[in-house]
Amino acid sequence: MTSGDTNTYDLIVVGSGFFGLTIAEQAASELGKRVLVVEKREHIGGNAYSEKEPETGIEVHKYGAHLFHTSNDRVWEYVNRFAEFTDYQHRVFAMHDGTAYQFPMGLGLINQFFGKYYSPDEAKALIEEQREGLDPAAATNLEERGIALIGKPLYDAFVKHYTAKQWQTDPTDLPPEIISRLPVRYTFNNRYFNDKYEGLPVDGYAAWLEKMASHELIDVHLDTDWFDVRDTIRGESPEAPVVYTGPLDRYFDYAEGRLGWRTLDFEQEVLDTGDFQGTPVMNYNDADVPYTRIHEFRHFHPERAEYPDDKTVIVKEYSRFAEDDDEVYYPINTPEDREMLKRYRELAAAESRENKVLFGGRLGTYQYLDMHMAIGAALSVFDNHVRTYFVDGKPIDQPRGH
């Protein structure tokens, strides 16, 4: 990162999450372009940012657990330019009716929940009986697909109430695609992710993100709201395209209405014990528990000998609808939202053509994107839209479906 000697830039990036930083880093390192990154928060990195809890020195993911995983060779090669990764493999347990169950859906959960051993074939037959004749491919909402995937008893115990808490929306009103991220296996493999590559940055997310932004041609302005400085910055760099990764509806001043987002609240505690729950993440699936899960961050880095033996940090996570002044995290994506999104995409396409603005990232495209997906999307947008603008002189145009 540099302080900069001039106010003229070749490219402006709004937001410093993985999408924005990937675009900025590639423009600087691959094209030699001078880039300004404008960030509303006091730190870079978006929701992936992490910091040490001062009393214990335990690294805490400030906006909830972030686990890096990908099967994309290009993405894995790219991120390894900026960070070394541990061999961490994510595993989750789920609390239901006072008992912690192995999760996600697999033979461990089935055998424990139903109180007897089922072989793979027996477990498949059991779930077939319990899916109520529903076909996952034909499901029209999350509840139908959930029952079709794991049967009604397991859906009711481990998905229904957790989903309602997480999204503040009835599962019958949520799209079926949301639950497609949930692994379903008929083995005792309890890894949460199936990807080829998985791990956590050895030195933490903050160090990784700062290295991405460290190129001498990149300037970062923190604590800066784009809408307060847009006219000034674009006036000083009138030819510079903008890559906007903030909320899509906010960019257009909610002209088509407010898209449905959810936000998260976090309750952090330092406890006088060396281990609170014995695992990094415990989901709380019952409706009478207000939080969705508890993170215990020491377990993400068991290799760190400097962590204290007599203290630990836990964070309870609560999910709710985002109100007007809240930070928005995830799109709810109801049918009404999807209709509104179509209209916003038309506005985005016009803005791209007329004012050289590209919309990207989770917030800028109203999509649920894991970290590797945001990075992969940014690399694609850079190759097919940013590079072609600077190298071939092609006009800026918004990617289809974004």
Model regions: which residues?
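Short alpha-helical segment within the catalytic ATP-binding CA
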Residues: T22
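Mid-domain catalytic core of redox enzymes
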Residues: E30, T224-A350
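Dinucleotide-binding Rossmann-like beta1-alpha1 core, especially the glycine-rich loop
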Residues: E55-E132
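Active-site/ligand-binding neighborhood in enzyme catalytic cores
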Residues: D97-Q102, L107-P241
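C-terminal lid/capping helical subdomain adjacent to the catalytic/cofactor pocket in oxidative enzymes
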Residues: D223, R230-G235, G257-L271, P280, ...
